[in-house]
Amino acid sequence: PVPKSQLVAEFREARAMLYRGDLNETFCLAVGEAQASGVPAVVGDLGSVVERVRDGETGTIARDDDTFAAAAVALLTDDALWRRQHEAALKARRAWGWPEAAAAFESLIP
């Protein structure tokens, strides 16, 4: 664990969040925090992380190792791609706040 101030500073410097995924992952706060900070994510097609990333918009959902590696390299080397996905991640964060979360939860209750 690191202090929140350090985590924020690390995300400000990050080009990409790389996470292979875990079959038992039910939320993946780390990817959520990265995306909320505007860091595009490259994730494996496994567990709940596929619900956090808008494939091709806020990051990449990689279906295999070659795609995962290529997407990571692309974010590190293609400034225009990084900028688009960075801005999309920030926009997605602003569109989902407590009122939206509460409404989504309430919609599940009959």
Annotate each language-model stretch with its function.
Residues 79-109:
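A charged, aromatic-enriched C-terminal amphipathic alpha-helix characteristic of glycosyltransferases
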Residues 40-43:
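Short hydrophobic beta-strand element within catalytic cores of glycosyltransferases
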